[in-house]
Amino acid sequence: MSGKTITRAQLSEAVYQEVGLSRNESADLLEMVLNEMSEALVEGDTVKISSFGSFSVREKGERVGRNPKTGEEVPILPRRVLVFRPSQLLKARINDGAVGSQING
């Protein structure tokens, strides 16, 4: 397991190398995809990417938590959280250690 982080610039470079668009076009394409995903999630929609997984926003209600140091009850306000659910194919690839191979689906 390498544990490295893939950046936006690296994704853009990968699009450039694989698709053959210019570097600027590749960066713009990636930016448009990420913006569309972000907008959909902000509106409460689910973003499903076949053979990869789905992103959704879940509403968490108000609840009572505790300060671990004092034991004092503290209200935790309602909020929205981002959830990612990987596809079965992605789960299988991760568990099989098929790092670097292409997802075909």
UniProtKB/Swiss-Prot annotation:
GO terms for cellular component: cytosol. Pfam families: Bac_DNA_binding (PF00216). InterPro entries: Hist_DNA-bd, Histone-like_DNA-bd_CS, IHF-like_DNA-bd_dom_sf, IHF_alpha. Belongs to the bacterial histone-like protein family. This protein is one of the two subunits of integration host factor, a specific DNA-binding protein that functions in genetic recombination as well as in transcriptional and translational control. Heterodimer of an alpha and a beta chain. This is Integration host factor subunit alpha. It comes from Rhodospirillum rubrum (strain ATCC 11170 / ATH 1.1.1 / DSM 467 / LMG 4362 / NCIMB 8255 / S1). The lineage of its organism: Bacteria, Pseudomonadati, Pseudomonadota, Alphaproteobacteria, Rhodospirillales.
